[in-house]
């Protein structure tokens, strides 16, 4: 046996390997079916015009690629020449216009054919559609002046067509393609330059009103394109103001306004007199006259345009508020003026009354000075119009003119105050907002203030709060006015307790604006007596707090006022200064230290040192890779603490400081999770450390979502860094999961998903990759081919090494960044009385919250209700529930419906506001994604929510239903 084995060992084995010829793989070329061929087949199958029209309608619903457009156009033109039915030719002409707008297709190749078929066409409808197609071609080729002039020539030839539709399209083409310059390029030397304005102006007197309207709109289109219109157009436009059709009058009003802005100082003669006037004043009078037009559409447009005519003379401006009666378009003269004219004339009469039957010249109403007739009482008519749209437009115009003229603001005050009693809520609200905008130029009299304060009884919360805002910036003339305002506001507080915060804020500004008027009222308001001690008021009374807010804010600039305070007033001041610091200012009281605010006034102007400190702190942190892990952690912790404190001290730097601190916190969590002592020992022996790393990865993910969606002003540079940090957190999560998961099947799927995330990052942020040198993603993309073919264990090992070796990316700070915040005003969460309702039914809970620096609150802000049993309910407020009182500020006033089964005792539910986000909607779209590759469902879905308000606890008690 041994000999046999020995023999086998020494034997030589030979093996012949014959290379087999590889079978050549068959290459398949996938081609898309030709759109032009399919259309040709369909049109050939059509047995009637109705069938052909149906095929064309089906084709119009399908998208066409740029490379297929020319072939499709040729097929359509071929069938156009063969087709006898005008409806089919009309549809083909429409399709030619749509196809010429296709991105990536140059329509100059079909222009000659379009012009040829235009010259032979007899149908007016098809002619109009072909002109529309030529307009689309010319709009697509704005740089080719030869084509533009050729199309203008075609339009001019067809302007004599009998159809109004054809003339309309020709004028539209002239307005959009007419040459703005007199210089002609070499390509267009053969074509004579035309005076487009004169051609269009000739059609101002066309017999068809639709053509007249199209001519005016074409002239306005020339103005929008940058061509300066001739002043001669002004007289033509003025004649159109008396046109029988409202569309013509509406367009003419707009054209007159445009010319008045181009030539405001030009002098124009007044008809039937030797006087002259500025063009802007004349135009103002004519537009004022249109405020009394028979059509409410024209009246609205005229009223809106009046507000933008700020160059008009003050004399004509003040005439708009003149209530003098008009007779035959002339001012009614006084009896003295009439008698004087009568006796000075020396005219004959019957003898019973001097000048009784003297012949008088008949008044020519058309020759009367239009300035006198138009501007006189224009706003009076507008504010008393039967249509509320006209009244709103007149109020807005008054606001714009009053802001530029303080004298006009004083004169229009009575009219605005009268509008507070309008029957339409929208008009009342607009009047209040208008008056608030001009409040710096006016001082209210007592009778006006009385009318204004009467609106506090309005049932609309929006009206009342708008009036509170108005009173914040209103000047009152007397102490009786201040007392009247306080009394009415306290009545409002009694009738509508939910207005408490708005009324307190109103009294804060009312007191700070009128310290000298509040001073003589202090003894009466505080019920103090020179000889007797009075009872101490209840500090829980909102009305008493309102009075104190008024007095304390007035005392800030009135040093003699604290001497009138009693002892309990000083105690109440200390209490309110702590509890309502945003309403009660710091006062220098006798015998007491100044209660200073968090930021003293001497520090406020010095913003540069704070900004410098912020920059130095961040630059110091960016040298982390040169430190040992322990030193890096300590440096990050100290810097985060400094940035948080800086945000508390400097409110204007709070957003930047919090944003930077959050980013550094993510880096700190990553460094702690990657400590070597956690990874040198087998994972089963360090389950606690694995949980720590997993929690760190989860927290980093949450912090990155906060950075991306809770801050306004974040630019694309910051979004890239945030997504990079999130990718590192996902890599850490994969590493931890790989160490604690048994089996390879789950890891294959997780690795594949992570590599898809990397590919996703590369595709969407490809333009920013050069700025990510030596970063985690940069190294990851270099090793991407190797990672695609590696086993999960090797992928995890590579990721762990790269996470430790990757550089700390520099976070560029945006210029202006603010953190989103929300404060729930109602419910206050102070009541111990439960809200009782029958189980199974619903109860409405009023929610009132202020939102700061929230982007798109209508789609992102949600209300969450958390029940004691762990159930959570998310409510989507209606868009109408959001108000926008100022830039960066929103107000949410809504109702939340609660329901639950019966409870044995009252418990608390938590109400908070959430910020919903979807990261895919924030990422910039790439060119190849514009074709609708992403479904709309993905973009509108909610990926997660971030709490951004403190929770408020509300007692509720669902009672069992009675049987």
UniProtKB/Swiss-Prot annotation:
Per the record, the coiled-coil ranges are none
Which UniProt keywords are given for this protein, alphabetically ordered? Answer: Acetylation, Cytoplasm, Isopeptide bond, Nucleus, Repeat, Ubl conjugation
Per the record, the covalent cross-link Glycyl lysine isopeptide (Lys-Gly) (interchain with G-Cter in SUMO2) lies at 791
Q: Where is this cross-link: Glycyl lysine isopeptide (Lys-Gly) (interchain with G-Cter in SUMO1)?
A: 791
What Gene Ontology cellular-component terms does the record carry? cytoplasm; INTAC complex; integrator complex; nucleolus; nucleoplasm; nucleus
> What, per the annotation, is the impact of changing residue 210 to A?
Decreased processing activity of the Integrator complex
Domain of life per record: Eukaryota
Subunit note: Component of the Integrator complex, composed of core subunits INTS1, INTS2, INTS3, INTS4, INTS5, INTS6, INTS7, INTS8, INTS9/RC74, INTS10, INTS11/CPSF3L, INTS12, INTS13, INTS14 and INTS15. The core complex associates with protein phosphatase 2A subunits PPP2CA and PPP2R1A, to form the Integrator-PP2A (INTAC) complex. INTS4 is part of the RNA endonuclease subcomplex, composed of INTS4, INTS9, INTS11 and inositol hexakisphosphate (InsP6). Interacts with BRAT1; interaction is required for the assembly of the RNA endonuclease subcomplex.
The protein's name is Integrator complex subunit 4
Q: Which organism is it from?
A: Homo sapiens (Human)
């Amino acid at each position: 046996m041994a000999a046999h084995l020995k023999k086998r060992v020494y034997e030589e084995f030979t093996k012949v390997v014959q290379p087999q010829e590889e079978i050549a793989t068959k290459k398949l070329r996938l081609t898309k079916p030709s759109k032009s061929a399919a259309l040709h087949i369909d049109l050939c199958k059509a047995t009637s015009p109705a069938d052909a029209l149906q095929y064309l309608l089906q084709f119009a619903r399908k998208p066409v690629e740029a490379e297929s457009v020319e072939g499709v156009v040729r097929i359509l033109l071929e069938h156009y020449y063969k087709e006898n039915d005008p409806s089919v030719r009309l549809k083909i002409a429409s399709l030619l216009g749509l196809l010429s707008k296709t991105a990536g297709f140059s329509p100059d190749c079909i222009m000659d054919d379009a012009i040829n078929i235009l010259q032979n066409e007899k149908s007016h409808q098809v002619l109009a559609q072909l002109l529309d197609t030529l307009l689309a071609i010319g709009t697509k080729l704005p740089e080719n002046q030869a084509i533009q002039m050729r199309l203008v020539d075609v339009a001019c030839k067809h302007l004599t067509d009998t159809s109004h539709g054809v003339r309309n399209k020709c004028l539209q083409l002239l307005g959009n393609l007419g040459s703005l310059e007199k210089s002609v390029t070499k390509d267009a030397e053969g074509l004579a330059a035309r005076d487009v304005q004169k051609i269009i102006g000739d059609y101002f007197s066309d017999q068809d009103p639709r053509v007249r309207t199209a001519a005016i709109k074409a002239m306005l289109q020339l103005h929008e394109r940058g061509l300066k219109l001739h002043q001669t157009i002004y007289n033509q436009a003025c004649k159109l103001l008396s046109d029988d059709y409202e569309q013509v009058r509406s367009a003419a009003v707009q054209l007159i306004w445009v010319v008045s802005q181009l030539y405001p100082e030009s002098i124009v003669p007044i008809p039937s007199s030797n006087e002259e006037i500025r063009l802007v004043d004349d135009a103002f009078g004519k537009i004022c006259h249109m405020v009394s037009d028979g059509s409410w559409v024209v009246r609205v447009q005229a009223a809106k345009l009046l507000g933008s005519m700020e160059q008009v003379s003050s004399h004509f401006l003040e005439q708009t508020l003149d209530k003098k009666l008009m007779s035959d378009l002339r001012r009614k003269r006084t009896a003295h003026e009439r008698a004087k004219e009568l006796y000075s004339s020396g005219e004959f009469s019957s003898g019973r009354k001097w000048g009784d039957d003297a012949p008088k010249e008949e008044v020519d109403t058309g020759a009367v000075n239009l300035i006198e007739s138009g501007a006189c009482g224009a706003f009076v008519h507008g504010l008393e119009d039967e249509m509320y749209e006209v009244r709103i437009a007149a109020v807005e115009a008054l606001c714009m003119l009053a802001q530029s003229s303080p004298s006009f603001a004083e004169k229009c005050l009575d009219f605005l105050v009268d509008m507070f009693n309008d029957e339409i809520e929208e008009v009342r609200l607009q009047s209040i907002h208008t008056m608030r905008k001009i409040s710096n130029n006016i001082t209210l009299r007592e009778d006006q203030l009385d009318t204004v304060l009467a609106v506090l009884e309005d049932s609309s919360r929006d009206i009342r709060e708008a009036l509170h805002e108005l009173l914040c910036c209103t000047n009152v003339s007397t102490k009786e006015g201040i007392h009247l305002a306080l009394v009415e506001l306290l009545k409002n507080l009694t009738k509508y307790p939910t207005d408490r915060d708005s009324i307190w804020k109103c009294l804060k500004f009312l007191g700070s604006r009128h310290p000298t008027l509040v001073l003589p009222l202090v003894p009466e308001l505080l019920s103090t007596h020179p000889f007797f001690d009075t009872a101490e008021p209840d500090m829980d009374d909102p009305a008493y707090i309102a009075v104190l807010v008024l007095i304390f804010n007035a005392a800030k600039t009135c040093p003699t006022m604290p001497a009138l305070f009693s002892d309990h007033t000083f105690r109440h001041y200390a209490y309110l200064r702590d509890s309502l610091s945003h309403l009660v200012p710091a006062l220098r009281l006798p015998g007491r230290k100044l209660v200073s605010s968090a930021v003293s006034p001497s520090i406020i102007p010095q913003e540069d040192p704070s900004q410098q400190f912020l920059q130095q702190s961040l630059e110091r942190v960016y040298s982390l890779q040169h430190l040992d892990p322990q030193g890096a952690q300590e440096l990050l912790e100290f810097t985060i603490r400094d940035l948080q404190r800086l945000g508390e001290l400097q409110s204007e730097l709070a957003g930047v400081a919090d944003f930077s601190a959050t980013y550094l916190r993510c880096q700190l969590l990553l460094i702690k999770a990657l400590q070597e002592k956690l990874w040198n020992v087998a994972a089963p022996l360090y389950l606690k450390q694995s949980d720590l790393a997993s929690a760190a990865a989860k927290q980093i993910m949450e912090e990155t979502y906060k950075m991306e969606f809770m801050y306004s002003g974040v630019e694309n540079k910051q979004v890239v860094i945030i997504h990079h940090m999130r990718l590192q957190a996902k890599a850490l999560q994969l590493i931890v999961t790989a160490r604690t998961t048994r089996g390879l099947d789950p890891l294959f799927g997780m690795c594949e998903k992570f590599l898809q995330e990397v590919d996703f990052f590369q595709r969407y942020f490809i333009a920013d990759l050069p700025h990510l040198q030596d970063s985690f993603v940069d190294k990851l993309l270099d090793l991407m081919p190797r990672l695609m073919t590696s086993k999960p264990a090797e992928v995890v090992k590579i990721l762990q090494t790269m996470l430790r070796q990757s550089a700390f990316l520099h976070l560029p700070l945006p210029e202006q960044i603010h953190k989103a915040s929300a404060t729930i005003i109602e419910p206050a969460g102070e009541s111990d009385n439960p809200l009782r309702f029958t189980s199974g039914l619903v109860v409405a809970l009023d929610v009132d919250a202020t939102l700061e620096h929230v982007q798109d609150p209508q789609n992102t802000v949600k209300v969450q209700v958390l029940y004691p049993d762990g159930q959570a309910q998310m409510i989507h407020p209606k868009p109408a529930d959001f108000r926008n009182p100022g830039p960066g500020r929103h107000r949410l006033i809504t109702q939340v419906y609660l329901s639950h089964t019966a409870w044995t005792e009252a418990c608390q539910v938590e109400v908070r506001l959430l910020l919903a986000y979807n990261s895919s909607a924030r990422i910039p779209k790439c060119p190849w994604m514009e074709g609708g590759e992403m479904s709309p469902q993905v973009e509108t879905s909610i990926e997660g929510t971030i709490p951004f308000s403190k929770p408020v606890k509300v007692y509720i008690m669902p009672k069992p239903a009675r049987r």
